[in-house]
Amino acid sequence: MKRDIHPEYVETQVSCTCGASFTTRSTISSGTVRAEVCSECHPFYTGKQKILDTGGRVARFEARFGKAAAAKK
């Protein structure tokens, strides 16, 4: 490898919105990374499914087409 052409490789603190944090190494100069999901809270790793706001879509569909249209399927 050539000298003095590679970015600085520093310890980086990664923190998730769930509160979990861990240390890794990265070329990010700030030394901190904020993530929305991590292995502590991601549904694939936890086995739990997050409920998204799909209830509004279903209610809007039923209001528009009625419950009979949904029951025919």
From Swiss-Prot:
Keywords: Metal-binding, Ribonucleoprotein, Ribosomal protein, RNA-binding, rRNA-binding, Zinc. GO terms for molecular function: metal ion binding; rRNA binding; structural constituent of ribosome. Binds 1 zinc ion per subunit. The keyword rRNA-binding applies. InterPro entries: Ribosomal_bL28/bL31-like_sf, Ribosomal_bL31, Ribosomal_bL31_A, Ribosomal_bL31_sf. Pfam families: Ribosomal_L31. Zn(2+) binds at residues 16, 18, 38, 41. Its cofactor is Zn(2+). One of its GO terms (biological process) is translation. GO terms for cellular component: ribonucleoprotein complex; ribosome. Belongs to the bacterial ribosomal protein bL31 family. Type A subfamily. Part of the 50S ribosomal subunit. Binds the 23S rRNA. HAMAP family: Ribosomal_bL31_1 (MF_00501). This is Large ribosomal subunit protein bL31. It comes from Streptomyces avermitilis (strain ATCC 31267 / DSM 46492 / JCM 5070 / NBRC 14893 / NCIMB 12804 / NRRL 8165 / MA-4680). The lineage of its organism: Bacteria, Bacillati, Actinomycetota, Actinomycetes, Kitasatosporales. The gene is rpmE.
